[in-house]
Amino acid sequence: MEAGETWNVSLEWPPPSLDLSTITQTPSTIVGSGIPLNYAGLSLIVIPLITLLGNLLVIISVLRYRALQSAINFLILGLAVADLLVAIIVMPYAVYVYVTNGDWYLGNLMCDIYMASDVCCSTASILLLAVISFDRYRAVSLPIQYSRQSQNVKRVWTLIAVIWLVSLTLASPMVFGVNVRPPDANPYECRFYNAEFSILSSMISFVIPCFLVLFVYIRIIIALKKREKAAKMRREKNTIAHGLTMRPDTGEEQVDEEAAGRIVAGPVVNVMMAALPSMTRRMRQFERHRRAIELAGDEEWEEDELDVMDECCGGDDAGDDDDDYHADNGQGVVEASAPRTTSMLRRIINAASVGTANSTAQSVASASGMPAFFAQNISTTSPSSSSCARTTTTTSAIPKASGDLPLPMLLNEREFGNSSTPRSSLESLSENVNVITNDFVSENCTTFSRRSSYADDSQPTSSQTSSGDGRSYSIKGQKRFRNLSRNYSTKHHRKVVKVNRGNSRNNSRTASITNQSDDALIPAIIRTISRKSPRLFRRDKTDIKKHSMILANPITEPPKEYRRVSMPIHPTNSQTETETISASRDIENLPTTTISRSTTANSAELLGSPDDFEKFPALITETVLEDVLAETREGCFMQPTVSFALTVREMEGNALNNLKGCSVESSRRVSQVDPPLAIQILTRPSLPHLDLQRMDSIGTTCSSKTRADSLRSVDSKGSKKSNRNGIAVKLVKRAIKHEHSLKRKVSKAQRKEKRATKTLGVVVGVFLVCWVPFFVINILNAVCILLNKDSCQVGYDLFFYCTWIGYMNSFMNPIIYTIFNTEFRRAFKSIIFGRNSTRHHFSNKQAHV
């Protein structure tokens, strides 16, 4: 019965102890308890719900899409987890406190758990923001070191674990008895009473990370400003330097036309550097990566291009190089000193480059559409016997007037910036290379020898002077360069000249080409290439018969059988391109004769059809022999001297106009020979191979030879070799494409880093706005408690609103990512709207970034 009575009492409602008079008429009180309620506070539940959904989207996006699985995004994932826990654990209790008008009816233990959860999750979120800021600082200040660890996910997870461990360690004392309530404390109030611990936790949770975030982000802004300023200055200077190299009347269309004819050194440099045994794959990849990072911020110009432009525009008179050309011991030596530049192609061309030097040669080049732009002096000597004086012929340099050269004479690194050759390898080679080619007649008529020789800096020479006007070339009045011929030589075959024209065996003929430099590396590189790839350097035996050497006498008018003698070239096994040819001949009954011989600076048959080079600018490489006319005095028998000049000419913007003018009509055309494939490497099929014809002593006539005719002839020649060597073409294109891809990847990565930095700035700004008021009030209240001054403490309402402003930081982070980060925005759309096509497109496009 007693149990039944007790049961009946327990079921009685309302309890007898409840005073029904305390129940008011307003609906804002709890029925039967007299606790006032603020139902308007239930609207705050929207904030944790949106925070929950937003951070869930961030977490799913990073875990689902491989493109977002980078180090920085995994840190953002950890931040989203912390904000998610804030929305699940902390915000609902804050809504409850607001609905109950600040009263806590859930007991002291739940109050301690609520405060510990608040401290732990908020501390983790703030520390993760600090780590993300430091990560952005490393990405901006140390990009190479950062790139090596950018995908180190293990390191990121370790940092996240450490941050959560610190946060739990900081919050756990609040649960294990640190929050001791005083005897007179309000039992319905949930607050932290330990002032010392409150100050310490605020310093660790907010103050130190806040100063770190501010310091790091200020440094990031300074670094970005410096980088943008430096890039802007480089672009301005390069634009000015580029403008100085062009004529004032150069129009936009002509600039495009000239740009299409610029020289590209990428293919040659790629092929040559591929043969160097010292360049390993790891070194090449590292150097390409380093250079691409350096160039990514500057899309149009390179820093080193300024040096090239300065050399191109530094002086307008090239006639001051008077001491560059010498002659000694009856050996005509032509020495050329080209301006120094970091261009690899510049050094290769300088190894065999001497410009034409008289007005007739200029007219021929102009008629052919190929102006001479290497200004150099050419000296020719004829050694005298004991009773004869030495006769010396000296030519002056061609002035580098801007009106004479529509395009820059020198090359710049922009033209082959897409080359995969490392920058260090370019600088490792010497600026100039000495090459000497000696052709002489030995005393033994049956002996033929061939050797390769290089110029020595210590070689004794005698200085020759130039007149400086670029047109004077006279011995006893008037001399002219003649017998210009373009005759391509065979590839890596010996060239033997058998000459039997007389009975004299005591006369020798010498011709030399020297390019002033510190060493001679280019011929060695060429030989290395030929040894590494012998099959690419061979030529069909049927092509050997097409080659010939031409002998002519420009001074007198001997019979036709003596004026032009075509002599076959007998091939032998040789891999050198710069050689010495020895032959014996009799010239007793013949007048002074000038020998014409052409050779190429690079005879490697490396690339295939010119049709594969539609994207390459044109490089017209002409091997021109300039015969220096030597006079003989009465009573003196002098040995004639032949001077060779190998010239690299560039098809300029006004080539079409020159071709429409007068062209020299020769009495004999050079035999039709396919050009060496090494020249085809640098030749674009859309631009013609211009034939330099021999000049006859009898007058010249004007003919209308247009560019289209030359183009058709080149295309017809190129079609014959369309099926030859396409492998090297593909390799070169692949290398250039890889370099383009590398630069695009680096540039794209830096753009993404910039967007991430911008997003970080917004996140940091929101973080400061949200959390600074709360922690200022929290520290101020703790100080007031230590000083026992209740008057300085902040009231409940202000403290509550500042706390909710701090919670809004977790609410704002996903919104910031959606607005300022295109990758997250695309991922959010794919998740919300279920766009599978968008997801697949996003994954495929960003998979390897």
From Swiss-Prot:
Residues on Cytoplasmic side: 61-70, 134-155, 225-759, 820-849
Per the annotation, which location comes first and is thus the protein's main one? Answer: membrane
Location relative to the cell = Cell membrane
Domain of life, source organism: Eukaryota
The membrane-spanning stretches of this chain are 40-60, 71-91, 113-133, 156-176, 204-224, 760-780, 799-819
Instruction: Fetch the SMART domains from UniProt.
Output: 7TM_GPCR_Srsx (SM01381)
Q: Name one GO molecular function term.
A: neurotransmitter receptor activity
Q: Does the keyword Aminoacyl-tRNA synthetase apply?
A: no
Q: What else is known?
A: Modulates drug-mediated behavior, such as the response to nicotine and amphetamine. Plays a role in the sensitivity to the drug nicotine and promotes movement towards nicotine sources. Plays a role in promoting amphetamine-induced loss of motility in water, termed swimming-induced paralysis.
Q: Which family is this protein grouped under?
A: Belongs to the G-protein coupled receptor 1 family.
Q: Which cellular component terms (GO) are annotated to the entry? A: dendrite; plasma membrane; synapse
Q: In which tissues is it expressed?
A: Expressed in all dopaminergic neurons. Expressed in neurons around the nerve ring and the posterior side of the body including PDE neurons. In hermaphrodites, expressed in the head and tail ganglia including in the RIA interneuron pair, and in a subset of sublateral interneurons and the PDA neuron in the tail. Expressed in cholinergic SIA neurons. Also expressed in the male tail. In males, expressed in the dorsal spicule protractor, ventral spicule protractor, dorsal spicule retractor and ventral spicule retractor muscles and the sensory post-cloacal sensilla B (PCB) neuron.
- Renumbered residue ranges of the record's region Disordered: 450-515
UniProt keywords, alphabetically: Cell membrane, Disulfide bond, G-protein coupled receptor, Glycoprotein, Membrane, Receptor, Transducer, Transmembrane, Transmembrane helix
Which ranges are annotated Polar residues under compositional bias?
501-515
Query: Where does the record place Low complexity bias?
Result: 457-470
What PANTHER family does the entry give? ADRENERGIC RECEPTOR-RELATED G-PROTEIN COUPLED RECEPTOR, DOPAMINE D2-LIKE RECEPTOR
Disulphide bonds in the chain: C111-C190
Q: What is this protein called?
A: Dopamine receptor 2
Stretches for region Required for the interaction with gpa-14: 183-849
